[in-house]
Amino acid sequence: MKIATIKTGLASLAMLPGLVMAAPAVADKADNAFMMICTALVLFMTIPGIALFYGGLIRGKNVLSMLTQVTVTFALVCILWVVYGYSLAFGEGNNFFGNINWLMLKNIELTAVMGSIYQYIHVAFQGSFACITVGLIVGALAERIRFSAVLIFVVVWLTLSYIPIAHMVWGGGLLASHGALDFAGGTVVHINAAIAGLVGAYLIGKRVGFGKEAFKPHNLPMVFTGTAILYIGWFGFNAGSAGTANEIAALAFVNTVVATAAAILGWIFGEWALRGKPSLLGACSGAIAGLVGVTPACGYIGVGGALIIGVVAGLAGLWGVTMLKRLLRVDDPCDVFGVHGVCGIVGCIMTGIFAASSLGGVGFAEGVTMGHQLLVQLESIAITIVWSGVVAFIGYKLADLTVGLRVPEEQEREGLDVNSHGENAYNA
């Protein structure tokens, strides 16, 4: 799809969904309803979407620990977001942080609007993104991290990594000023979370028996259910990042459908060739790979670009969870880096290509060439990787020094459900 009327679009769209529009401050009821629905969909991605997806991927003796970690970190992020997160991410400030004018949402009038939606809805929508990002990380730490360590890490990482990167990309900070394109969270959400997960997986070490015992998903129907919820919720994630129910939201919606379908096929046929059989897990993983890959691009590219990004993301994700994972020698139980990191990087780079009007996209900002845009995209990826990696290292080390990162070996063997939470998912 080609939208020829948006020549100035990318200069401003690069700051979506954190953009404060310059249009008259008039709330539109339809846009507000649309954004509230999108916010609810993104919240639904975390609870229960990502919890069920990850819960099914791990062993049955640890499934409740995963559901608990996702649920409690979700609650923690919600509180931190309204206390200071939103203000530091989207308040006016410097290249890295906003200000403190909106602490506890102070100074935000009930009737304050951003573009055509009430600012309170913007607070909730952006908070839902912070929640899902933190939820993604815990999959890399599954089956051996101490519950209290997760909470300490989340406070540090949300404050010093998620918030500044969100400000840099969507809040008018450094990367926004450079013209980085990230429509719905390729850098802010997926690469950011994947790097934090990878660092954590290295620091916490491999699970007891890793490489010697067969660690298989204990409940594939649960994985499928989680995938379906994530898929539906992702339409709120991507289309909602337009900030209004307009033609860009429609474009993002269609591109999400196309890229997901293409990635499922890409992953499945790749797996079929590699292993001799297509699997349900492969189809679910392919869907997530396509959704991740199209996230930074969905509002900038045409349908042809979405198709290509989907296929490439599907194959790249398959490579990420097989060959790259073996190369890295890391125990990432839910393949957070292999899917979200690899496909997030692929999507961000390809956004700089397929946003070109000659390739069906909405076109670059005036005077910007594809080569320049690709350099900016690479810059945004590099900054996100380094920033998130350093902050994650600090966060994990702080948690380790205070409460210890990992549960004792005997507790790990017995399972975190019983030892950390005093419950069993499957009682005889």
UniProtKB/Swiss-Prot annotation:
InterPro entries: Ammonium/urea_transptr (IPR029020), Ammonium_transpt (IPR001905), Ammonium_transpt_CS (IPR018047), NH4_transpt_AmtB-like_dom (IPR024041)
Keywords for this protein: Ammonia transport, Cell inner membrane, Cell membrane, Membrane, Signal, Transmembrane, Transmembrane helix, Transport
GO molecular function: ammonium channel activity; identical protein binding
GO cellular component: plasma membrane
Activation/inhibition comment: In the presence of high extracellular ammonium concentrations, transport activity is inhibited by interaction with the regulatory protein GlnK. Ammonium transport through AmtB is required for GlnK sequestration. Formation of the GlnK-AmtB complex is influenced by intracellular pools of the effector molecules ATP, ADP, Mg(2+) and 2-oxoglutarate. The rapid drop in the 2-oxoglutarate pool upon ammonium influx and a simultaneous, but transient, change in the ATP/ADP ratio promotes AmtB-GlnK complex formation.
Function: Involved in the uptake of ammonium/ammonia (NH(4)(+)/NH(3)). Transport is electrogenic. Following sequestration of NH(4)(+) at the periplasmic face, NH(4)(+) is deprotonated and neutral NH(3) is transported into the cytoplasm. Neutral NH(3) and charged H(+) are carried separately across the membrane on a unique two-lane pathway, before recombining to NH(4)(+) inside the cell. In vitro can also transport the larger analogs methylamine and methylammonium. Also acts as a sensor of the extracellular ammonium concentration.
Protein name (record): Ammonium transporter AmtB
Underlying gene: amtB
